[in-house]
Amino acid sequence: MSKLQDVIVQEMKVKKRIDSAEEIMELKQFIKNYVQSHSFIKSLVLGISGGQDSTLVGKLVQMSVNELREEGIDCTFIAVKLPYGVQKDADEVEQALRFIEPDEIVTVNIKPAVDQSVQSLKEAGIVLTDFQKGNEKARERMKVQFSIASNRQGIVVGTDHSAENITGFYTKYGDGAADIAPIFGLNKRQGRQLLAYLGAPKELYEKTPTADLEDDKPQLPDEDALGVTYEAIDNYLEGKPVSPEEQKVIENHYIRNAHKRELAYTRYTWPKS
């Protein structure tokens, strides 16, 4: 293992192997402890995309909220559907919601807000690329979730995990923003393992991962965008050897996107080289 890989493995907290029952108990306990230590929290808010990550986090949150209510703590899980117009995989979103069984479902179509933002910028002389418009979608989705959380005395739960965090494969202040990130410390295959253990439909954790933010490239697979497979990323995070080419791609993503893992730099915290 290279020196940088060792540093990254320590930072990303991924275990070489997990016991599903123990891991789920630990994840639920983290969520419950956070709620119990912040008496203002009356709701937990999460956007549901129909993908592996939000399905897993949604199920964990609902299980945690159920237990909290049994313990006398009043709180609600609000699952949010955030389509941009008509969502291509809307059936999988509904399948995920049936599996999660959330207390409440809110639907907000982000298309009018995103399109208006893009148009307003265009009128100001700022013409966004399709990729940049994709980031607008991600930020609008998170803005909506925080608005709901503010209205309902809640917090926003994130879906960031270590295979995503290492690559910076999320929008800064978009899907990378949240109050808590329960599944950080898991890689992609471990997330699949937990969903299988929880009895999720295979379609939800065996589907090809995609951020699906670009109009010009609908359902673009994450692995195509990253230039490396999740299998390689997971192996790297577990301290296993990967090919020199895979190592270079992974470490380049890690270094280039370091700013996404930090709060806004100050003159005291900027890591000058």
Curated annotation (Swiss-Prot):
Catalysed reaction(s) here are: deamido-NAD(+) + NH4(+) + ATP = AMP + diphosphate + NAD(+) + H(+)
What does the entry list under GO cellular component? cytoplasm
Identify the metabolic or biological route this protein is part of.
Answer: Cofactor biosynthesis; NAD(+) biosynthesis; NAD(+) from deamido-NAD(+) (ammonia route): step 1/1
Q: Which Pfam families match?
A: NAD_synthase
InterPro entries linked to this entry: NAD/GMP_synthase, NAD_synthase, NH(3)-dep_NAD(+)_synth, Rossmann-like_a/b/a_fold
GO molecular function terms here? ATP binding; glutaminase activity; metal ion binding; NAD+ synthase (glutamine-hydrolyzing) activity; NAD+ synthase activity
Give the Enzyme Commission number. 6.3.1.5
Q: Name one GO biological process term.
A: NAD biosynthetic process
* Enzyme's top EC category: ligase
| Keyword field | ATP-binding, Ligase, Magnesium, Metal-binding, NAD, Nucleotide-binding
Q: Which residues does the annotation say bind ATP? A: 47-54, 159, 188, 210
- UniProt-annotated binding residues for deamido-NAD(+): 139, 172, 179, 259-260
Q: Which domain of life is it from?
A: Bacteria
Residue positions annotated to bind Mg(2+) are 53, 164
Among PANTHER family, the record links this protein to: NH 3 /GLUTAMINE-DEPENDENT NAD + SYNTHETASE (PTHR23090), NH(3)-DEPENDENT NAD(+) SYNTHETASE (PTHR23090:SF7)
Describe its assembly. Answer: Homodimer.
Which HAMAP family does this chain map to? NadE_ammonia_dep (MF_00193)
**What job does this protein perform?**
Catalyzes the ATP-dependent amidation of deamido-NAD to form NAD. Uses ammonia as a nitrogen source.
- Entry similarity comment: Belongs to the NAD synthetase family.
Question: Protein name, please?
Answer: NH(3)-dependent NAD(+) synthetase
What organism is listed for this UniProt entry? Staphylococcus aureus (strain bovine RF122 / ET3-1)
